[in-house]
């Protein structure tokens, strides 16, 4: 998905990461911080319109991690829906 040009998010145990492929960076946000972070992105970060790619972190340490990721995924999906942003779910590696 390195050719994806809209925001790319990874659901993690500790929140949601906004991936910047050009700098090989991940900025981690709590669910309530994500709307502001996405709103601060320039219009050029949204060439496909109001859609983001979302992937779950494939590295999990057990049942508790899976529960936290599932929780964060649900919060993220609800947040993006309330912002009228579509989700392109990407399978975990």
Place the predicted regions along the sequence by residue.
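Long, low-hydrophobicity, acidic/polar, solvent-exposed interaction domains
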Residues: 1-93
């Amino acid at each position: 998905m390195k050719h994806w040009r809209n925001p790319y998010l990874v659901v993690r145990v500790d929140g949601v990461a906004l991936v910047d492929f050009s700098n090989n960076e991940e900025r981690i946000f709590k669910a309530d911080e994500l709307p502001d972070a996405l709103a601060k992105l320039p219009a050029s970060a949204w060439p496909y319109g109001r859609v983001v790619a979302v992937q779950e972190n494939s590295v999990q340490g057990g049942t508790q991690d899976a529960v936290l990721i599932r929780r964060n995924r649900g919060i993220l999906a609800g947040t993006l829906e309330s912002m009228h942003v579509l989700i392109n779910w990407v399978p975990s590696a």
